[in-house]
């Protein structure tokens, strides 16, 4: 979307705060159903970010795949599980929590040191800067691949780390 600067900045701040609040809801809400709905809200906010970046195909794929399929699957899985087992043997702090805290703190510190060095202005306006490269490409999927491997490399890696952590968490929950 080609919006004026102040409106674009307001929408970025609004969606960013929605992402932060939704992420906190995923982690802090005690009811898994509410956490799943909060995750759906986060995924919708991410797709709206893609719309602001003029990536309509990625936004549509985000909505269809993650919100429409994955989040609904999570909600069904949570609904079929026994709700009383979440509150049995509740320990406030375990060794795994300490290790997880150290790993997450390390990732957070590395991201805080990496993110200020990133040219975020260049990421937002890549559609204008890569016009010569895009003329040589034939399909939109090739353009998406080039952008993911050049301009959007850091956000793509952050998403892959988040998906890896989610996969490890799903395996840990499935073993219990």
UniProtKB/Swiss-Prot annotation:
Assembly with partners or alone: NDH is composed of at least 16 different subunits, 5 of which are encoded in the nucleus.
Its biological purpose: NDH shuttles electrons from NAD(P)H:plastoquinone, via FMN and iron-sulfur (Fe-S) centers, to quinones in the photosynthetic chain and possibly in a chloroplast respiratory chain. The immediate electron acceptor for the enzyme in this species is believed to be plastoquinone. Couples the redox reaction to proton translocation, and thus conserves the redox energy in a proton gradient.
Source organism of the structure: Coffea arabica (Arabian coffee)
Chief subcellular location: plastid
Keyword Transport assigned: yes
Membrane topology, from the record: Multi-pass membrane protein
Range of residues in the leader sequence: none
Alphabetized UniProt keyword annotations: Chloroplast, Membrane, NAD, NADP, Plastid, Plastoquinone, Quinone, Thylakoid, Translocase, Transmembrane, Transmembrane helix, Transport
Similarity section: Belongs to the complex I subunit 6 family.
Pfam families in UniProt: Oxidored_q3 (PF00499)
Gene designation per UniProt: ndhG
Protein name listed in UniProt: NAD(P)H-quinone oxidoreductase subunit 6, chloroplastic
